[in-house]
Amino acid sequence: MKKIRLGVIGTGLAWERLHYPALKELADRYEVAALVNRTRSDAEAFADKIGLDRKNVYDNYEEMLKRNDIDAVDVLVPIDQNYKVSEDVAKSGKSFICEKPMAPDIGQAREFLELSRKHIVKIMIAENYRYNEENNKIKQLISEGRIGSVVYFIKNNITCFPCEMAEDTYAGTEWRQHPDFPGGAFLDAALHDLAAVRHIFGAVECVQAFGKPQKEDFNPYLSVSANMLFKNGVIGQYTYFPSGKEQQKPPVGFRIFGTKGEIYLEEKSSGVINVAYNDGAPEKIGYTPERGYYNELLNFYNALNGSEDISVTPEMEFGDVKTVFDILDSVKSRKIVYVDDPQPVEYQPHAGATENSRPYIQ
């Protein structure tokens, strides 16, 4: 089995705590061949930790991209740099993984779609929620009709970003506290949840959202609440509250109501999916939490070796990112915003505004 020699751009928290632990499990498939970080000493410290010679450490990723012995690249940089770094990697002819979101705004996200069309490279967007076991099992339960036809869902995400700002956490990073991109934490974190519901229910027809504004830099709204209509007729309500604490137990979590029963996921790390059927019978379905990183890196390896396709392509991720920005647009305009469908003709400002090609429809 040929190992993929991986070059890493960005050796911060996402690399150290998410990608590298998964790569250790895949040591028979991957070899870390080079590390790049703008603070070179941080990359050198990590190289020492894993026994990588410091000659393979860089503070300039362009130098690393010149190497012919690098098979693929893992891009883990701040959100505002994702597109620029990815473009340079694509131009080098190397296949790569890019952490989500693919870009800091919808314009750069559209440009990202062109990278795999212009360059003969394979690109994965590392949206781990699409690879997490709980979301795939829930999707399977629904496709099997275990709770009948889905009528609606409720999904709550309540966290305390301010509580973690002074700690050694993602919230403690300067660029997340004072983001140089629209949406702040909503783009960074709520994107995961929206990717999950799109993975489970499919393409979104339209959204209508409201937000409670705040002055703090990390997120433009104290909370955001969005009503969602999916193309298959499912309706649902998603709320993101990054400055709160959910004191009552069990939490609202993720609840899906069908004609024959209900699915309840307390939180992604709970390890169990609760199913309650209308005849009174309960069922508990176990899963291993946080397997998305392992699964996505395994998928990337298999794709590079030609045994399977990449599951989360830029086209797939574009729909997730567009949903985020469409929700934010709806909050600002207080209007319904169409996501994966063009706006109905009767509401078009002019006939030429309709888009016929929607590559991100799932």
What spans do the regions from the language model cover?
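N-terminal Rossmann-like dinucleotide-binding module
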Residues: M1-I50, Y360-I361
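Active-site loop of classical SDR/Rossmann-like NAD(P)-dependent oxidoreductases
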Residues: A14, R38, G286-L298
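Hydrophobic residues in well-ordered beta-strands that form the structural core
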Residues: W15, D59, C98, I123-I125, ...
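Glycine- and charged-residue-rich phosphate/anionic-cofactor binding loop of Rossmann-like
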Residues: E31-V32, P282-Y287, A303-D320
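Beta-loop-alpha module in the N-terminal Rossmann-like domain of NAD(P)-dependent dehydrogenases
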Residues: K55-L115
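Rossmann-fold dehydrogenase core element
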Residues: E111-Y129, S149-V151
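Predominantly a Rossmann-like dinucleotide-binding segment in NAD(P)-dependent oxidoreductases
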Residues: Y129-E216, R334
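Contiguous beta-strand/loop segments that form the cofactor/metal-binding neighborhood of enzyme cores
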Residues: D188, L194-S270, Y294-I310, D340-Q362
